[in-house]
Amino acid sequence: MAYYLYMLRCEDGSIYTGVAKDYLKRYEEHLSAKGAKYTKSHKVVKIERVFLCDSRSIACSLESEIKKYIKKKKENIISKPDSFIKDIENVRKIKIKKIF
């Protein structure tokens, strides 16, 4: 079953990364302070990037990896998503698709 990996911009400029079956519903939860603990204290302002993954395990694995990145590397994923996808496909031998 497909899952989405999403990246949100917060009011303070930070980037939140998460996983959901329905990223738009989850985005609404983040906006209404019903989302993650982090987004309750760091107000979400917009969706920056969304990727479609073939499974929850792939999405969660990528989420965990991205959360360890420094901000500059996260910004590169947002600004150059095709490079990120190419790297993931070459290194991890998995397919993901840019949605937004």
UniProtKB/Swiss-Prot annotation:
InterPro entries: GIY-YIG_endonuc (IPR000305), GIY-YIG_endonuc_sf (IPR035901), UPF0213_domain (IPR050190). CDD domains: GIY-YIG_UPF0213 (cd10456). Pfam families: GIY-YIG. Residues 1-77 form the GIY-YIG domain. It comes from the Bacteria. Belongs to the UPF0213 family. This is UPF0213 protein FN1575.
